[in-house]
């Protein structure tokens, strides 16, 4: 699910960057460090909103090397998946144990135990696929998956998905 979240980040700035364009440099550094990153607590930070209203607090000089530390407050669009959420994605790998679906920046693994009984793995096809009388699920197939559980790590989020219910599976 997508959220708008108020966040903050401490940015350390070397003295060589002190000057009239310091705020511009801090904003650029914020975008480089934050956009596309993942925090286990908030999820994937997709983009920073309202670039002109990023709040840069007063800096604090660090006693060790003369660098300054700034607390930068900003608003961002965040993607955080939840158990029970239904998402669309693209199959990126397929094996006898299940297949993996890319949903934005996150990967969802669908094990064969969470697929309908009539889907069978066909290793002889190129590329490998799951087939039934109605559907074929192979690499690059568009698929609708229900998230059964999420695993948050420091720099990524992985999920387990199911296509066993109605209206789930190949699109």
Swiss-Prot record:
Keywords: Cytoplasm, DNA-directed RNA polymerase, Nucleus, Transcription
GO MF, one annotated term: single-stranded DNA binding
Ion transport listed as a keyword: no
Subcellular location per the Swiss-Prot or TrEMBL entry: Nucleus; Cytoplasm; Cytoplasm, P-body
Stored Pfam families: S1, SHS2_Rpb7-N
One GO term describing the cellular component: RNA polymerase II, core complex
GO BP of this protein: DNA-templated transcription initiation; nuclear-transcribed mRNA catabolic process; nuclear-transcribed mRNA catabolic process, deadenylation-dependent decay; positive regulation of nuclear-transcribed mRNA poly(A) tail shortening; positive regulation of translational initiation; RNA-templated transcription; transcription by RNA polymerase II; transcription elongation by RNA polymerase II
Note: Present with 6420 molecules/cell in log phase SD medium.
Subunit structure: Component of the RNA polymerase II (Pol II) complex consisting of 12 subunits. RPB4 and RPB7 form a subcomplex that protrudes from the 10-subunit Pol II core complex. The RPB4-RPB7 subcomplex probably associates with TFG1. Interacts with NRD1 and PAT1.
Family of this protein: Belongs to the eukaryotic RPB7/RPC8 RNA polymerase subunit family.
Protein name (Swiss-Prot/TrEMBL): DNA-directed RNA polymerase II subunit RPB7
Organism expressing this protein natively: Saccharomyces cerevisiae (strain ATCC 204508 / S288c)
Lineage: Eukaryota, Fungi, Dikarya, Ascomycota, Saccharomycotina
Gene: RPB7
């Amino acid at each position: 699910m997508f959220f708008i979240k108020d966040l903050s980040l401490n940015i350390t700035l070397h003295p060589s960057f002190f000057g009239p364009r310091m705020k511009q440099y801090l904003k650029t550094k914020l975008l480089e460090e934050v956009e596309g990153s993942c925090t286990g607590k908030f999820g994937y930070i997709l983009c920073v909103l309202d670039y002109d209203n990023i709040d840069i607090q007063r800096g604090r000089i660090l006693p060790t090397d003369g660098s300054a530390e700034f607390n930068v407050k900003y608003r961002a669009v965040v993607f955080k998946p939840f158990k029970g959420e239904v998402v669309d994605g693209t199959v990126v790998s397929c094996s006898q144990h299940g297949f993996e679906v890319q949903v934005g920046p996150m990967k969802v693994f669908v094990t064969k135990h969470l697929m309908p009984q009539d889907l069978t793995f066909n290793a002889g096809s190129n590329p490998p696929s799951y087939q039934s009388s109605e559907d074929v699920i192979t690499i690059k197939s568009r698929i609708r998956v229900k998230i059964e559980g999420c695993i948050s790590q420091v720099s990524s989020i992985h999920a387990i998905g199911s296509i066993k219910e109605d209206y789930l599976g190949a699109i």
